[in-house]
A protein has these predicted regions:
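Extended, hydrophobic interaction surfaces within ordered domains
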Residues: 1, 170, 214-222, 229, ...
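Phosphate-binding loop of NTP-binding sites
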Residues: 1-120, 129-135, 299, 321-327, ...
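Residue-level signal for inorganic ion chemistry
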Residues: 14, 50, 67, 79, ...
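Active-site beta-loop-alpha junctions enriched in small/polar residues
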Residues: 17-19, 69, 126, 209, ...
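Hydrophobic "anchor" residues on beta-strands that sit immediately upstream
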Residues: 63, 87, 120, 203, ...
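Nucleotide phosphate-binding/pyrophosphate-handling subdomain across enzymes
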Residues: 78, 155-260, 340-357, 363
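Acidic, Mg2+-coordinating active-site environments of NTP-dependent enzymes
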Residues: 86-203, 229-230, 255-264, 270-283
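A charged N-terminal "starter" segment
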Residues: 304, 315-365
Length: 365
């Protein structure tokens, strides 16, 4: 809460049963060019994840976006005090964690705590009872109903829930007086920090979904844990929308690369190449991803731990495909409803007030 109190930019809080991460990433993608912003990593929206996210703020961003997730009454009170959002975006309402609430209305009441001090509110009236409750409770603040905004054509975004998410992003941009978003397609959220076997006995860490300083720091830390005794290669693209001058930006990047023990850098893009002198490790640079695929030095691959970290425009998925070891597809189906049932069964056997800690084993997340 203290760290948040020092921040002078605009803070956005996103809550709802589903769609928080998708809408957060979509909003970040549609922000005005050149704006320095921060968004919480992955799905850091819990009682632990939110404080960690706030502590990652550098302090000079214009906009910060956080998710807030709850599983029982009382949790949003704490999250609201930490985030203190100026703008709140409500996504959908559903049955997630319903076992800890008397009814859906109680859950909506809990979620609306996040907006008690917000000056701007965005919601979608399709999602009842949340929509009606938000409209009534915050009528004096004239909340933005996303249902009033044009629906993206089905030919562009086929999924109805994704089209409603797009309307929420439209409403947010209108509330903030940003240019209207230009939707090309629905955003996809592939598994970040995906580890695969690479060619030439390498390990490939694919985190090519987005790129900013915060996510780069997290990815480099992950590389350190995966690499063990292997030498480390970073494949990095130009970074856009940092809000920093190129000299300051790539100076920071060079420091992060050095501290992470990266000994080979492959830079893609003209801005990185112009700042090649900042990097003390072995390095090579390419104008485009396609050129890199065609000319990459095999020394940078064989037996190494390779981190792919690129902005979406650079299409690093093509590079990941080129460097990945070919294998047959294996499908693992996980029944989350069954997992929830099992967790609640064992919770019912515990004494009242006993807390649970869930651990996801190794790199399975």
């Amino acid at each position: 809460a203290y760290h948040r109190a020092q921040f002078r930019g605009t803070v956005v809080g996103i809550t709802g049963s589903n769609g928080k991460t998708v809408i957060k990433e979509w909003i970040a993608e549609e922000l005005p060019a050149g704006m320095k912003y921060y968004r919480s990593p992955k799905s850091y929206n819990s009682q632990l994840g939110v404080p960690l996210s706030v502590l990652m703020l550098e302090g000079d961003e214009e906009l910060a976006i956080f998710e807030a997730g709850i599983s029982k009454p009382g949790e949003m009170e704490r999250l609201e005090r930490i985030i203190r959002p100026d703008v709140v975006v409500f996504t959908s309402i559903g049955d997630a964690h319903q076992e800890n609430f008397l009814n859906l209305e109680q859950k909506c009441d809990e979620k609306m705590v996040l907006a008690r001090n917000a000056s701007k509110i965005v919601y979608h009236s399709y999602y009842e009872p949340l929509g009606g409750m938000v409209a009534a409770r915050f009528a004096d603040r004239k909340p933005f109903d996303a249902a009033a905004f044009p629906e993206v054509p089905e030919s562009v975004i086929g999924n109805a829930a994704s089209r409603r998410n797009a309307q929420i992003v439209e409403a947010f941009c209108a509330a903030m007086h940003y240019p209207a978003p230009s939707f090309a397609s629905a955003p996809t959220l592939p598994m970040r920090l995906e580890v695969k076997e690479g060619i030439n006995d390498s390990i490939l860490i694919n985190d090519a979904y987005n790129l900013d300083l915060n996510s780069l720091a997290l990815a480099l830390d992950y590389l350190h844990g995966v690499a063990l005794n292997r030498r480390r290669t970073l494949v990095l693209s130009d970074i856009s929308q940092s809000g920093l001058s190129d000299d300051e930006l790539y100076g920071r990047v060079a420091g992060m690369v050095a501290r992470a023990g990266v000994d080979f850098l492959i830079g893609i893009g003209p801005r990185l190449k112009r700042h090649a002198g900042l990097f003390g490790c072995d390095k090579e640079f390419y104008a485009s991803t396609d050129e890199c695929i065609a000319r990459i030095d095999r020394r940078a691959v064989a037996g190494r731990a390779i981190l792919l970290k690129g902005a979406r425009d650079f299409r690093f998925e093509k590079l990941a495909h080129a460097l990945a070891r070919r294998s047959h597809t294996t499908v693992l189906e996980v029944d989350l409803d069954a997992m929830t049932h099992n967790l609640n069964f064992f919770r019912s056997k515990l004494s009242f007030g006993t807390k649970l800690v869930a651990m996801v084993k190794a790199g399975s997340y």
